[in-house]
């Protein structure tokens, strides 16, 4: 399971989501609210990941079945663990 913390702006301009989790071909959106956690799941069509600069910088592009495109980019630490900032655009 791959997890990104950050934000995502979907095509229908819903409010920002706090966390995206990729699990079993599904993309899970989680938005934390005062009354609890709101979730939304959509299927994923493709995931393309590119790591540059000897594993320090990474960029992941996720294409959903709804045609939404998500770009997660950021840096890895010395152990190669992702430290990400999530950017979303159509």
Where are these regions (language model features)?
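Acidic, Ser/Thr- and proline-rich intrinsically disordered linker/docking segments
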Residues: 1-13, 28, 38-90
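Short, compositionally biased strand/turn segments
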Residues: 14-35
């Amino acid at each position: 399971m791959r997890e990104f913390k950050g934000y995502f702006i979907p095509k229908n301009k819903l409010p920002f989501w706090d966390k995206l989790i990729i699990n079993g071909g599904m993309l899970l959106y989680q938005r934390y609210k005062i009354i609890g956690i709101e979730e939304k799941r959509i299927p994923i069509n493709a995931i393309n990941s590119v790591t540059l600069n000897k594993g320090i910088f990474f960029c992941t592009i996720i294409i959903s079945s709804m045609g939404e495109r998500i770009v997660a980019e950021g840096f890895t630490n010395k152990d190669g663990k992702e430290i990400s900032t999530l950017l979303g655009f159509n």
